[in-house]
């Protein structure tokens, strides 16, 4: 007697279709298309988790550089000065300071120049 895949296959397909929820067209309800779309989406998600870190670091550097230039220095001189002064503030905090508290950022720049 032939044994069918039964509930295991259905469970696997439903898992894929659940992941494809929100997709457009046949990608949301046709298993084969949904499976391809979900695989690609998961690949992109994995890749872009790393890319997101790079993008944010670049954004922080741009913001710090812009604020540093308003205070009469450059990004590279600012970071070199901070390292020399022994000030351990990471780029994320520096960018937040530059955006939200320009006065405090100016004090940090002053400490780096000294």
UniProtKB/Swiss-Prot annotation:
Pfam families assigned: Ribosomal_L20
GO molecular function, one term: rRNA binding
Statement: the UniProt record of this protein carries the keyword Plastid: no
GO BP terms, alphabetized: ribosomal large subunit assembly; translation
Listed Gene3D superfamilies: 6.10.160.10, Ribosomal protein L20
Keywords per UniProt: Ribonucleoprotein, Ribosomal protein, RNA-binding, rRNA-binding
Entry-linked InterPro entries: Ribosomal_bL20, Ribosomal_protein_bL20_C
One cellular component term from this protein's GO annotations in UniProt: ribosome
Entry's transmembrane regions: none
Record flagged with keyword Thylakoid: no
PANTHER family: 39S RIBOSOMAL PROTEIN L20
Role: Binds directly to 23S ribosomal RNA and is necessary for the in vitro assembly process of the 50S ribosomal subunit. It is not involved in the protein synthesizing functions of that subunit.
Family: Belongs to the bacterial ribosomal protein bL20 family.
Record's protein name: Large ribosomal subunit protein bL20
Organism: Anaeromyxobacter sp. (strain Fw109-5)
This protein's encoding gene: rplT
